[in-house]
Amino acid sequence: MIPIIALVGRPNVGKSTLFNKLTHTNDAIVADYSGLTRDRKYGHAKWKNYNFIVIDTGGIGISKKGLAIHIIKQSLLAIKEADVIFFVVDAITGLMIEDQSIAKYLRKLQKPTFIIINKIDGIDITQVKLQFYAINIGQIFPIAALQGRGINILLKAVFLSLIQNNIPLTNNSFTESTKYIDQLLMPIKLAIVGSSNVGKSTLANSFLGEERVVVFDMPGTTRDSTYIPMIRAEREYVLIDTAGLRKRSKITDIAEKLSTVKTLQSIEESNVVLLVLDAHKGISDQDLSLLSLIIDSGRAFVIVVNKWDNLSIERRNSIKDTLAYRLSFINFARIHFISALYGTNIDQIFQSVNEAYHCSTKRISTALLTKILHIAIKEHQPPIISGYRVKLKYAHYGGYNPPIVVIHGNKATELPVSYKRYLSNFFRHSLQIMGTPIRIQFNEPANPFIHHKSIPNKLRKLLLSKRNIKIK
């Protein structure tokens, strides 16, 4: 299961700072969704070998009538769906009446809750902790989110608590050969995601259609996902339900139509993601945010432009030009123009899904990767940094889904972004990787003398003189 952690608290206590620390915002994509999840932030995070999802629920205020939660209905639902609550408070201001009201609200949820006392620098934390012991809703952890102090201890306690409560977790540590064989034998898990009313459920029904073998609810690793097994062209797949796959008669709550939390879970649990766009609406900023989340997760993906029927040639050409411009940064992705309603061009989607899955899980030898690296260097030498040319020595395979290439060399981590991008593109084209992101990691050998103190000059002369060694 991918645990969900919700950050809750009144405004200006440092929730966003903690969110950025947990998600490593410089690397991870943070999506700000408009409309359904306006002003809320969702992000992927990782601690040790465990992945989790973080939700910044925004500020909770208080009115004359008591607790007034100034967040939209879907954010409340996200809090209720969370596995763990981080109740963030301010060490400088201490316990406030708003904190007491929020604690009263959280106590009703009966979720594992951790009190996070932020901004502890220069504060007598013992006195502050005594104030918050009174609300008695969970363990207390003092942190400095801006500096990152105390966060590792906090996360260790969180995951220890989850394990002790027998909650299954998704662990990235594995035995390479065993997991790779299992991956090849398992059905391809296919998540269908997209904005509302783009035709996700119509596409799913078109997939199932005559080829549907059995439909049942298979309890998955994410609490609210429905898994629908199917077979197409003798290949097994599992469609991951993201609310749009349910029958319309069963959807009574607007939150079920598009839950960002469920979408994030579906992406994490899938092997390949189908991002569905509406040909009539083009690609929106929300579509691009969702695409960024998919890329950030490292999942293979295929883009499907639905409702392609009944469009003029001029309109189709215009849409293709717009997509080519706005999606130029993902020239490795397959794009299909279909009509889910009439089943037009559906079969080609599965060809691209299989290709993307194969590319994301393929194994590559160290010899081949090193050979490609040397060819890339020969065609375009690494730059000179601080008077020395970067020397890249060898490359090896670092993982799959997404494919990871680890390059070793002196000053490798100091390479400019432009050269790193060149190497990434070179490996992609050389290995013919389509439909999946590829990640390049750079390692350089540790300096064995970095922690050795130099010998004072006088002592050095004395030692050498005892050995009858002349110093020039």
From Swiss-Prot:
Positions bound to GTP 1: 9-16, 56-60, 118-121
Protein name, per record: GTPase Der
Alphabetical UniProt keywords: GTP-binding, Nucleotide-binding, Repeat, Ribosome biogenesis
Subunit structure: Associates with the 50S ribosomal subunit.
Matching InterPro entries: G_ENGA (IPR031166), GTP-bd (IPR006073), GTPase_Der (IPR016484), KH_dom-like (IPR032859), KH_dom-like_a/b (IPR015946), P-loop_NTPase (IPR027417), Small_GTP-bd (IPR005225)
PANTHER family linked: GTPASE DER
Binding site for GTP 2: 194-201, 241-245, 306-309
GO biological process: ribosome biogenesis
Family: Belongs to the TRAFAC class TrmE-Era-EngA-EngB-Septin-like GTPase superfamily. EngA (Der) GTPase family.
An annotated Gene Ontology molecular function: GTP binding
Domain of life: Bacteria
Function: GTPase that plays an essential role in the late steps of ribosome biogenesis.
NCBIfam families: GTPase_EngA (TIGR03594), small_GTP (TIGR00231)
Residue ranges of domain EngA-type G in the record: 3-166, 188-361
Pfam families linked: KH_dom-like (PF14714), MMR_HSR1 (PF01926)
Domain KH-like: start-end pairs: 362-446
SUPFAM superfamilies in the cross-refs: P-loop containing nucleoside triphosphate hydrolases
